[in-house]
Amino acid sequence: MGAELNILDELGTVDLPDFVLQSLDLAIASIHGPCYSTNSEITEKGSRDLNTQAYLNVMKNPYIHIIGHPDDGRFPVDYERLVRGAKETHTLLELNNSSQRPEGFRVNTEENAKVMLELCKKEGVYITTGSDAHIDIDVGGFSCIEKLIQEADFPEELIATTSYEKFSRLIRQKG
Protein backbone atom coordinates (compact mmCIF):
# COMPACT_ATOMS: atom_id res chain seq x y z
CA MET A 1 0.00 0.00 0.00
CA GLY A 2 1.24 3.50 -0.74
CA ALA A 3 0.37 7.16 -0.49
CA GLU A 4 1.27 10.54 -1.91
CA LEU A 5 1.91 12.91 0.95
CA ASN A 6 1.82 16.67 1.11
CA ILE A 7 4.99 18.46 2.14
CA LEU A 8 3.67 21.06 4.54
CA ASP A 9 6.68 23.31 5.16
CA GLU A 10 10.41 23.82 4.66
CA LEU A 11 11.10 21.54 7.62
CA GLY A 12 9.91 18.62 5.49
CA THR A 13 6.86 17.94 7.63
CA VAL A 14 4.35 15.69 5.89
CA ASP A 15 0.67 15.12 6.56
CA LEU A 16 0.91 11.56 7.89
CA PRO A 17 2.67 10.58 11.12
CA ASP A 18 5.64 8.20 11.07
CA PHE A 19 3.66 5.39 12.69
CA VAL A 20 1.41 5.37 9.60
CA LEU A 21 4.28 5.93 7.15
CA GLN A 22 6.21 2.95 8.44
CA SER A 23 3.31 0.68 7.54
CA LEU A 24 3.33 1.80 3.89
CA ASP A 25 5.19 0.01 1.13
CA LEU A 26 5.69 3.25 -0.78
CA ALA A 27 5.52 6.94 0.11
CA ILE A 28 5.77 9.84 -2.33
CA ALA A 29 6.20 13.36 -0.95
CA SER A 30 5.16 16.33 -3.07
CA ILE A 31 4.62 20.05 -2.74
CA HIS A 32 1.02 21.01 -3.46
CA GLY A 33 0.09 24.70 -3.31
CA PRO A 34 -2.94 24.55 -1.01
CA CYS A 35 -1.06 22.51 1.61
CA TYR A 36 2.37 24.12 1.56
CA SER A 37 3.47 27.14 3.54
CA THR A 38 6.79 28.31 4.82
CA ASN A 39 7.57 29.96 8.11
CA SER A 40 9.16 32.79 6.18
CA GLU A 41 7.93 36.29 5.46
CA ILE A 42 8.00 35.27 1.80
CA THR A 43 4.43 34.86 0.62
CA GLU A 44 5.08 33.57 -2.90
CA LYS A 45 5.07 29.93 -1.71
CA GLY A 46 8.59 30.23 -0.41
CA SER A 47 11.84 30.99 -2.10
CA ARG A 48 14.01 28.70 -4.16
CA ASP A 49 16.12 28.07 -1.07
CA LEU A 50 13.16 27.31 1.21
CA ASN A 51 11.54 25.01 -1.35
CA THR A 52 14.84 23.19 -1.84
CA GLN A 53 15.19 22.90 1.93
CA ALA A 54 11.71 21.39 2.16
CA TYR A 55 12.69 18.67 -0.31
CA LEU A 56 16.07 18.03 1.32
CA ASN A 57 14.49 17.74 4.76
CA VAL A 58 11.72 15.40 3.64
CA MET A 59 14.30 13.17 1.91
CA LYS A 60 15.92 12.60 5.32
CA ASN A 61 12.74 10.82 6.41
CA PRO A 62 13.48 7.08 6.03
CA TYR A 63 9.86 6.39 5.09
CA ILE A 64 9.80 8.73 2.06
CA HIS A 65 10.87 6.92 -1.11
CA ILE A 66 10.06 9.37 -3.91
CA ILE A 67 9.88 13.12 -4.44
CA GLY A 68 6.82 13.75 -6.60
CA HIS A 69 6.80 16.22 -9.49
CA PRO A 70 9.77 18.36 -8.40
CA ASP A 71 9.63 20.01 -11.84
CA ASP A 72 6.78 22.38 -10.94
CA GLY A 73 8.12 25.89 -11.54
CA ARG A 74 5.55 27.39 -9.20
CA PHE A 75 7.87 26.10 -6.48
CA PRO A 76 11.40 26.89 -7.73
CA VAL A 77 14.14 24.54 -6.58
CA ASP A 78 17.93 24.29 -6.78
CA TYR A 79 18.24 21.14 -8.89
CA GLU A 80 21.92 20.61 -8.11
CA ARG A 81 21.14 20.43 -4.39
CA LEU A 82 18.00 18.36 -5.00
CA VAL A 83 19.86 15.75 -7.07
CA ARG A 84 22.74 15.60 -4.58
CA GLY A 85 20.25 15.14 -1.74
CA ALA A 86 18.46 12.37 -3.62
CA LYS A 87 21.76 10.58 -4.18
CA GLU A 88 22.79 10.87 -0.53
CA THR A 89 19.44 9.62 0.81
CA HIS A 90 18.62 7.03 -1.89
CA THR A 91 15.45 8.92 -2.76
CA LEU A 92 13.98 8.62 -6.25
CA LEU A 93 13.00 11.74 -8.20
CA GLU A 94 9.81 11.50 -10.21
CA LEU A 95 9.50 12.49 -13.84
CA ASN A 96 5.79 13.18 -13.99
CA ASN A 97 3.81 12.81 -17.22
CA SER A 98 0.91 14.96 -16.02
CA SER A 99 3.36 17.81 -15.36
CA GLN A 100 4.49 17.73 -18.97
CA ARG A 101 1.07 17.87 -20.60
CA PRO A 102 0.70 21.05 -22.71
CA GLU A 103 -2.63 21.85 -21.07
CA GLY A 104 -1.23 21.25 -17.57
CA PHE A 105 -1.32 23.80 -14.78
CA ARG A 106 2.28 23.44 -13.61
CA VAL A 107 4.79 25.91 -15.05
CA ASN A 108 8.25 25.61 -16.65
CA THR A 109 8.07 21.86 -16.25
CA GLU A 110 9.82 20.89 -19.47
CA GLU A 111 12.80 23.17 -18.82
CA ASN A 112 13.02 22.05 -15.20
CA ALA A 113 12.72 18.36 -16.10
CA LYS A 114 15.53 18.69 -18.65
CA VAL A 115 17.81 20.26 -16.04
CA MET A 116 16.90 17.56 -13.52
CA LEU A 117 17.47 14.74 -16.03
CA GLU A 118 20.86 16.12 -17.06
CA LEU A 119 21.99 16.36 -13.43
CA CYS A 120 20.64 12.90 -12.60
CA LYS A 121 22.50 11.47 -15.58
CA LYS A 122 25.72 13.21 -14.53
CA GLU A 123 25.42 12.14 -10.87
CA GLY A 124 24.04 8.63 -11.47
CA VAL A 125 20.77 9.37 -9.67
CA TYR A 126 17.71 7.23 -10.33
CA ILE A 127 14.42 8.63 -11.49
CA THR A 128 11.00 7.08 -11.41
CA THR A 129 8.24 7.68 -13.91
CA GLY A 130 4.68 8.48 -12.98
CA SER A 131 1.57 9.12 -15.03
CA ASP A 132 -0.03 11.07 -12.15
CA ALA A 133 -3.33 10.29 -13.81
CA HIS A 134 -6.11 12.57 -12.73
CA ILE A 135 -8.60 10.64 -14.88
CA ASP A 136 -8.78 6.93 -15.64
CA ILE A 137 -7.79 7.14 -19.31
CA ASP A 138 -4.41 8.63 -18.33
CA VAL A 139 -3.34 5.77 -16.05
CA GLY A 140 -0.05 4.42 -17.37
CA GLY A 141 0.28 7.20 -19.95
CA PHE A 142 3.87 8.29 -20.46
CA SER A 143 3.93 9.88 -23.92
CA CYS A 144 5.12 13.29 -22.72
CA ILE A 145 7.96 12.00 -20.56
CA GLU A 146 9.06 9.35 -23.07
CA LYS A 147 9.88 12.23 -25.41
CA LEU A 148 11.89 14.04 -22.71
CA ILE A 149 13.79 10.88 -21.78
CA GLN A 150 14.73 10.30 -25.43
CA GLU A 151 15.73 13.93 -26.02
CA ALA A 152 17.90 13.89 -22.89
CA ASP A 153 19.48 10.59 -23.98
CA PHE A 154 18.76 9.50 -20.42
CA PRO A 155 20.18 6.05 -19.63
CA GLU A 156 17.62 3.30 -19.11
CA GLU A 157 19.67 1.88 -16.25
CA LEU A 158 18.86 5.02 -14.21
CA ILE A 159 15.09 4.65 -14.71
CA ALA A 160 13.81 2.77 -11.67
CA THR A 161 10.51 1.80 -13.25
CA THR A 162 11.88 -0.31 -16.10
CA SER A 163 11.27 -3.44 -14.01
CA TYR A 164 9.50 -4.37 -10.82
CA GLU A 165 12.67 -5.99 -9.49
CA LYS A 166 14.76 -2.84 -10.00
CA PHE A 167 12.09 -0.57 -8.54
CA SER A 168 11.60 -2.83 -5.53
CA ARG A 169 15.36 -3.08 -4.90
CA LEU A 170 15.77 0.70 -5.03
CA ILE A 171 12.82 1.31 -2.71
CA ARG A 172 14.31 -1.11 -0.17
CA GLN A 173 17.61 0.85 -0.18
CA LYS A 174 15.86 3.76 1.51
CA GLY A 175 16.10 3.95 5.26
Where in this protein do the model-derived segments appear?
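Short histidine/acidic/glycine/proline-rich micro-motifs that form metal-
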Residues: 7, 71-74, 99-101, 133-136
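Short secondary-structure boundary segments
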Residues: 31, 95-98, 131-132
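Short hydrophobic "helix-edge" motifs at membrane interfaces and signal-peptide entry regions
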Residues: 59-60, 120-125
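His/Asp/Glu-enriched short active-site or ligand-binding loop at hydrolase and phosphoryl-transfer sites
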Residues: 92-105
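Hydrophobic alpha-helical segments
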Residues: 99, 123-126, 136, 151-155
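Short acidic/histidine-rich active-site segments
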Residues: 125-140, 159
